[in-house]
Amino acid sequence: MSTRTPLPTVNERDTENHISHGDGRQEVTSRTGRSGARCRNSIASCADEQPHIGNYRLLKTIGKGNFAKVKLARHILTGREVAIKIIDKTQLNPTSLQKLFREVRIMKILNHPNIVKLFEVIETEKTLYLIMEYASGGEVFDYLVAHGRMKEKEARAKFRQIVSAVQYCHQKRIVHRDLKAENLLLDADMNIKIADFGFSNEFTVGSKLDTFCGSPPYAAPELFQGKKYDGPEVDVWSLGVILYTLVSGSLPFDGQNLKELRERVLRGKYRIPFYMSTDCENLLKRFLVLNPVKRGTLEQIMKDRWINAGHEEDELKPFVEPELDISDQKRIDIMVGMGYSQEEIQESLSKMKYDEITATYLLLGRKSAELDASDSSSSSNLSLAKVRPNSDLSNSTGQSPHHKGQRSVSSSQKQRRYSDHAGPAIPSVVAYPKRSQTSTADSDLKEDGIPSRKSSSSAVGGKGIAPASPMLGNAGNPNKADIPERKKSPAVPSSNTASGGMTRRNTYVCSERCAADRHSVIQNGKENSAIPDERTPVASTHSISSATTPDRIRFPRGTASRSTFHGQPRERRTATYNGPPASPSLSHEATPLSQTRSRGSTNLFSKLTSKLTRRNMSFRFIKRLPTEYERNGRYEGSSRNVSSEQKDENREAKPRSLRFTWSMKTTSSMDPSDMMREIRKVLDANNCDYEQRERFLLFCVHGDGHAENLVQWEMEVCKLPRLSLNGVRFKRISGTSIAFKNIASKIANELKL
């Protein structure tokens, strides 16, 4: 694959001194002096100019916020992919720093198969690096936008995992406080991973918390009322909103502005879709209770009839954290071969230092999908789950009773989850490299060499997802997701594809210092409260196709939303760091709930609207730049002379195979090169700028530079092996859902495939 030349509009300015040198803060990390290992072998061969952080080779930016960015990276010693959250500490005030360190401390003590795992912490004088699981399956939010509501069987499988993970947090006296569809990630096997603990806090029974934080549509009524709370009950309310969202594809409480939303939440009335089962409705009534004292606990909800339907012999129970497995001799032997001594390995693991040794040990316990693929795979492919398309339907042994009804997966996929096996999934034939003794100061990080785009991600960065933590020893995930037959269905044609029916929600926090502002909003929110009790269901008008999903409430309201994607970049909707900036009342740059919202009569409201409407989108393309394929004479239809070697290379190049098909807008039996030629023709006809990033991947831009109508997206021709067809994958990078829907549907309809 030829080297990509990023468009100027998405170039990223250099990051200041992202090199692991200097002593880290002891409360955050304990590092050895050899965190700068460079690649020296076939697993991670690289040129000197490639940027590194510690033992990690940076691949591309997958998330970006005010004070942080998230990069996809590969661990040089093991070849595993990770997400690295890079936080600029110099931009944070003391309060924000304190919350950042609290987030790190909380992530260190969490060890659940459905919670994103922290591997390593590297700290310099100016920068903090959090190395975490990489999310290859994306967000539940994006799944719902692309696929519509889940069937209750599928929703139950996901929700059991969510409840198990949140209850585990509560039993460790941790409250998340920002549970929403955007912070629920999917790993390669479509299992849930909860991410983004930036708003989490430790609670004590008998003590009250008083910080209002989270996303308003998911926030409990007591938060809108400015009341103090114990902690777990606000998560329980958010789980009720999530359950409703999974089953219906829409929010139970919504409004065109914050005041309207607040009134609907405080009224506590929501529409029950006709297709929702009685058991599911009854479960919702245990979550969405206005009085927090009467709201159900997760221990009680785990015994609910709907939760355990189909799992009668294996009722959902509180997760029992297994003893830490720090004595796996197979992994230790591999690390000794890398150059680590037995003594330093034991010291690091016994103290759980979260240094390079801890990270290497943890990563060795994970089967890397990338090892199954060619090392020459493009970095674009790294953003998706690279699993073999074929499925061994016979490999279904060794699963817990929770796996009944789950789709079978190939043996390579099952090796991905260490907790599903009696031992870590360590390839026996892989020759692991030896660590380098080179200091990190020798490897200056030059991020301008990485194609980067305005993108988003949650705390995990690709909100970093991988399977269950190897620290779980032999304990299997008791809540592994049931994947319904939906995943095996043919790709949906353009005319039937569900699209952007949901609008991304922003998270913010009111600190104690803005209590007066919050009270003002609450009091003023009582004015003009003549709002109908029930919303009339309206078919979504935001489908890519003319056929809409009839059972989904109209979700978007023209919001200039900015989305969070894993594995695929998109403009950031919130700061990757999840703590408040200099403003005492806001923690994120966010987007107004609606473009038509009032400009705010209160201090908090004005802060929200003024702070949240800023855009860094003041650019446009005047002329499409020549792509690499055009410059090298490899542009289809070009009359330039092309060498026979180049022709052979083009002829042998094949589209990437996709395991899932919900992002497909159209399918065709046409030759992939002919499909690319047709796509370029339609893009030119619609005045779209584009760049050919790879053989079958285009990065596209449309609009006049204003935030309301500027859209960036990817179009890729992919192979659908199960259907023996090729498809066109659309992936929104930035811009509003409405603007993307308009241009994407126009292009899809004009394609003659």
UniProtKB/Swiss-Prot annotation:
Stated regulation of activity: Activated by phosphorylation on Thr-211. Inhibited by phosphorylation on Thr-564.
Active site, per annotation: 178 (proton acceptor)
Domain UBA: 326-365
Protein's cellular compartments: Cell membrane; Cell projection, Dendrite; Cytoplasm
InterPro entries reported for this sequence: KA1/Ssp2_C, KA1_dom, Kinase-like_dom_sf, MARK1-4_cat, Prot_kinase_dom, Protein_kinase_ATP_BS, Ser/Thr_kinase_AS, UBA
UniProt xrefs under Pfam families: KA1, Pkinase, UBA
EC number: 2.7.11.1
Membrane topology category: Peripheral membrane protein
Domain KA1 intervals: 695-744
Residues bearing the modification Phosphothreonine: 211, 549, 564
Catalytic activity: L-seryl-[protein] + ATP = O-phospho-L-seryl-[protein] + ADP + H(+); L-threonyl-[protein] + ATP = O-phospho-L-threonyl-[protein] + ADP + H(+)
Keywords from the UniProt entry: ATP-binding, Cell membrane, Cell projection, Cytoplasm, Kinase, Membrane, Nucleotide-binding, Phosphoprotein, Serine/threonine-protein kinase, Transferase
Annotated Low complexity bias: 374-385
Region of interest (Disordered), ranges: 1-35, 372-504, 521-604, 632-656
Record's compositionally biased regions (Polar residues): 391-400, 492-504, 538-549, 584-604
Residues modified to Phosphoserine: 42, 368, 374, 376, 380, 383, 400, 419, 469, 540, 543, 583, 598, 601, 643
Protein kinase domain ranges (all copies): 56-307
Free-text description of this protein's post-translational modifications in UniProt: Phosphorylated at Thr-211 by STK11/LKB1 in complex with STE20-related adapter-alpha (STRADA) pseudo kinase and CAB39. Phosphorylation at Thr-564 by PRKCZ/aPKC inhibits the kinase activity.
PANTHER family linked to this entry: MAP/MICROTUBULE AFFINITY-REGULATING KINASE, MAP_MICROTUBULE AFFINITY-REGULATING KINASE 3
Quaternary state and interactors: Interacts with MAPT/TAU. Interacts with DLG5 (via coiled-coil domain). Interacts with STK3/MST2 and STK4/MST1 in the presence of DLG5. Interacts with YWHAB, YWHAG, YWHAQ and YWHAZ. Interacts with PKP2 (via N-terminus). Interacts with CDC25C. Interacts with KSR1.
Family to which the UniProt record says this protein belongs: Belongs to the protein kinase superfamily. CAMK Ser/Thr protein kinase family. SNF1 subfamily.
Protein name: MAP/microtubule affinity-regulating kinase 3
Organism from which the protein derives: Mus musculus
Gene that produces this protein: Mark3
